[in-house]
Amino acid sequence: MQMILFKMNQQHYLIAAETVEEVVDTVQITKVPLAPLWVKGLINLRGTVLTVISLAQLVGLPESKTNRNIMIMKKDDERRGLLIDEVIEVMDVDPDDIQLSEDQAALYFTGVVDLGEQTIADVIDVNDKIF
């Protein structure tokens, strides 16, 4: 399966390429009063208003200081932006290489993939918690 490898907070993550519509440069994010901390706010992307979320804050990690991109994810008819530092590459991952990990925040990750060279990537589950 094709997956997108990206970096956030010096950690690597994988997300199914079929769930990603595009990656754009970070634009001005309008804060939403009383929204959860992981909801960074709203953006206007070519006339469409999208919610932008912080995966780091969603799973309790420190907020990244270098969010340079917003990954636009889609599920059914909904779209959300995910703050990331950078896309590294699109790669093929054998589903059998995804190892389940009880240490992960199971609501957001399906497992981990060993990419070699001391790099382990968490596999993001685009589910109802993100959408």
At which residue positions do the language-model features occur?
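An acidic, low-aromatic, low-complexity terminal/linker signal
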Residues: 1-131
